[in-house]
């Protein structure tokens, strides 16, 4: 299954490492990543894939709650199917 993870918060050291480590722990592969810092505000979008027989979006979101709290971030995960459906005419 493919999904999109968005990460936002005040910039500081270790954000990418924390999110990538949690993804690895969950068996989530990072296919592509885009990140930028604007006026001290960090934003990152990750295109990820995972075996949906091993985990699901709700489990990943719940597991990211620790990273959100520890890193003072907002992390959201959504199925890529949502984005695909929005672009079908």
Swiss-Prot record:
InterPro entries: ACT-like_dom_sf, ACT_dom, UPF0237/GcvR_regulator, UPF0237_ACT. It comes from the Bacteria. CDD domains: ACT_1ZPV (cd04872). Residues 4-78 form the ACT domain. NCBIfam families: PRK00194.1. Belongs to the UPF0237 family. This is UPF0237 protein DIP1286.
């Amino acid at each position: 299954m493919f999904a999109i993870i968005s990460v936002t918060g005040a910039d500081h050291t270790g954000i990418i490492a924390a999110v990538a480590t949690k993804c690895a722990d969950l068996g989530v592969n990072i296919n592509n990543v885009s990140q930028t810092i604007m006026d001290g505000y960090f934003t990152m979008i990750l295109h990820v894939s995972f075996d949906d027989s091993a985990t699901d979006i709700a489990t990943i979101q719940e597991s990211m709650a620790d990273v959100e709290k520890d890193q003072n971030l907002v992390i959201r995960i959504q199925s890529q199917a949502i984005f695909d459906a929005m672009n079908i005419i």
